[in-house]
Design a protein with these regions (language model features):
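Conserved helicase RecA-like core
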Residues: 70-459, 489-490, 498
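N-terminal intrinsically disordered, low-complexity tails of helicases
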Residues: 1-102, 320, 500-502
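Intrinsically disordered, low-complexity repeat segments enriched in small/polar residues
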Residues: 7, 31, 330, 465-467
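Long, compositionally biased
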Residues: 456-474
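Compositionally biased, intrinsically disordered low-complexity regions
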Residues: 19-24, 42-45, 49-51, 115, ...
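The feature captures the C-terminal accessory region of ATP-dependent helicases
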Residues: 471-502
Length: 502
């Protein structure tokens, strides 16, 4: 398939404004235009902790001209290479999610796309299959990728790469993952060897371009995944600089849970008459997600948090700072709970290992900062706990997006002390959510009914690395140690705002 667009994008002005981007644990396609904008699901009852209305303060979806191509109900109905269809079957993927069935007929035909929806809606394959199908059969020159996926965090970059890798292999396309915190030399080598598809965080990709290790002039398909998070993390200047370097007539796809001012600017500046598929940011909440605000007393919050963590099953707990995360993790381990910390102060290898342990169940409680957990996708996770309430309704929606993914059920629980109640009410109003509100104390039946809380064993536990990881570290050590100066030189001089913020 030829990824070049027939419309002349370069004739359109690009002068639009660019984006700018209290507990003891707390810290204070043939068709070239898009479908008419579709709104999210209608509101449901307001008293059962579900999401009754659209998020306040968002911009309207763009109005486009030509209707979208009709949605499909089976991948076999799509104009995709047979190898991709076979790979879908091999991966056990049989029926497209709504966002896939709606957007793929159009993106396979080369149209720009705007997908508005929460994580877990199936958007990775929605953009990934179109990107791979339209790039198949081409070969990239050294340092000149043909397709680009920009994401806000390293973890999300790795998850996108892992999700698309079997499909890329099926059509003989090479992928490279370009993120901070990893060897920039190895990433440069991968680009020099030729990679048709690059999945990148903005900061590291800019570093490689500045070094002369990558050029974007041949990129014909560009995807921005979780664009609102990139804006929140301050990446908009880098994102716009990168988008200005790709082929001006190329295809653009943008996916975002919310459509705020910065994302709206990206849509107006870089998308040409996009096909629009809108899933309410918490559409899963309408039928599968419950929202609970638990009023707790400050003196009891520590014990309440510990009992929730001791539940059967996995849970992600959010706190505001790295110090608070480490403090709670240590307390949970001492109480007999298999917990691990995730924040920007941890080495990338340690974060990757922690995520693997959490996904496999070796760790049952992931204690994380808001930024560090962005982009984490874990299947069958049914509880997210805001130990420290978020300060922004978008952060609340992103935290909640870790559960009730892909139609699964889940709950978001926020612990609120008396002095936080007014702010939490305002936040929920801004998010368009009417939660179930309950006064709870540790050890009470209501807490157990809502969260599965139970008394911890009290027997301290230690989380050790899996045997394979220990063997790998042993092999690395046997090859000799580098000097501190040498090791320091291996760290990129340009660290992304992720580490500073997490």
């Amino acid at each position: 398939m030829n990824p070049t667009r027939t419309n002349n994008r370069s004739s359109r002005s690009r002068a639009a404004d660019s984006g700018r981007g209290g507990s003891r644990f707390s810290s204070t396609a043939s068709a070239r235009s898009a479908a008419p904008a579709r709104s999210g699901g209608s509101g449901r009852s307001a008293g059962n902790g579900r999401r009754p209305a659209a998020v306040q303060g968002e911009f309207a979806l763009p109005v486009t001209v030509t209707p979208a191509l009709p949605a499909v109900e089976a991948f076999a109905d799509l104009d995709m290479p047979g190898q991709l269809l076979a790979a879908l079957t091999a991966q056990g993927v049989s029926v497209p999610f709504p966002i896939q069935g709606a957007t793929l007929p159009n993106t396979l035909a080369g149209r720009d796309a705007l997908g508005r929806g929460r994580t877990g809606s199936g958007k990775t394959l929605a953009f990934g299959l179109a990107l791979l199908a339209r790039t198949a059969g081409q070969r990239a020159e050294p340092r000149q990728p043909l397709a680009l996926v920009l994401v806000p965090t390293r973890e999300l970059a790795q998850q996108v790469t892992d999700a698309l890798a079997p499909y890329a292999r099926s059509v003989r396309l090479r992928m490279a993952t370009v993120v901070g915190g990893m060897s920039i030399g190895r990433q440069a080598n991968a680009l020099r060897g030729g990679a048709e598809v690059v999945v990148a965080t903005p900061g590291r990709l800019k570093d490689l371009i500045d070094r002369g290790d990558c050029r974007l002039g041949q990129v014909a398909i560009t995807v921005l995944d979780e664009a609102d998070q990139m804006a929140d993390m301050g990446f908009m200047p880098q994102v716009t600089e990168l988008l200005d370097q790709v082929r001006p007539e190329g295809q653009r796809m943008l996916f975002s849970a919310t459509l705020d001012r910065n994302v709206d600017r990206l849509v107006r500046r870089y998308l040409t008459d996009p096909v629009v598929h809108s899933v309410d940011p918490s559409a899963g909440a309408v039928t599968t997600m419950e929202h609970h605000v638990l009023h707790v007393h400050g003196a009891d919050k520590n014990r309440t948090t510990t009992e929730i963590a001791a539940r059967d099953g996995r849970v992600i707990m959010f706190l505001d700072t790295k110090r608070a995360v480490d403090k709670l993790t240590d307390h949970l381990l001492a109480s007999g709970v298999r917990a691990a910390a995730l924040h920007g102060g941890k080495a990338q290898s340690q974060r990757t290992r922690t995520l693997t342990q959490f996904k496999t169940g070796h760790v049952t409680v992931l204690v994380a900062t808001n930024v560090a957990a962005r982009g984490i996708h874990v299947d069958n996770l049914d509880l997210v706990v805001n130990v420290d309430p978020p300060t922004d309704h978008k952060d609340y929606l992103h935290r909640g997006g870790r559960t009730a993914r892909a139609g699964e059920s889940g709950s978001v629980v926020t612990l609120v002390t008396p002095n936080q109640r007014r702010d939490m009410t305002r936040l929920m109003t801004a998010a368009g959510i009417v939660p179930q509100t309950t006064q709870v104390r540790s050890g009470e039946e209501a807490l157990g009914r809502i969260t599965g809380a139970q008394t911890p064993s009290g027997i301290p536990v230690t989380i050790t690395a899996p045997v394979a990881a220990r063997r790998e570290r042993s092999r690395s050590a046997s090859r000799g140690r580098r000097s501190p100066a040498s090791a320091a030189r291996r760290v990129s001089a340009h660290q992304s705002s992720f580490d500073a913020a997490a």
